[in-house]
Amino acid sequence: MNLDNNAHSVFLLHYHLVLVVKYRRQVFDDSISSRAKEIFEYIAPNYNITLEEWNHDKDHIHILFRAHPNTEISKFINAYKSASSRLLKKEFPQIRQKLWKEHFWSQSFCLITTGGAPIEVIKKYIESQGQRERKRK
């Protein structure tokens, strides 16, 4: 496992982000998804974010990414949604016919933290902390 680091910490923070088109309008195809991914990869380094995985369905995208602890994820998501909405509508004018009042993305999003170990393993690890120390006393 390769950990990320900065001057004072070591970390590995993965997030699963799902962004949905407003009113679930079916606008994504491979070319639009590919361009949306390019926009993500262009903006992400400004927020210390690294794309790990990308996939789409007709009305939403799934993004797996890594971030630093000081990353303001909600600011990044808003910046991405704003830029991608503007650029995708400009570069793919046919999208506008499917949208409602020029709104591309739903206001809401789903953001889930992910990790390398199942939650139960982490809970047991946390519960066991200090037990060896208590046994020594």
Model segments located where?
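Basic nucleic-acid-binding interfaces
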Residues: 1-137
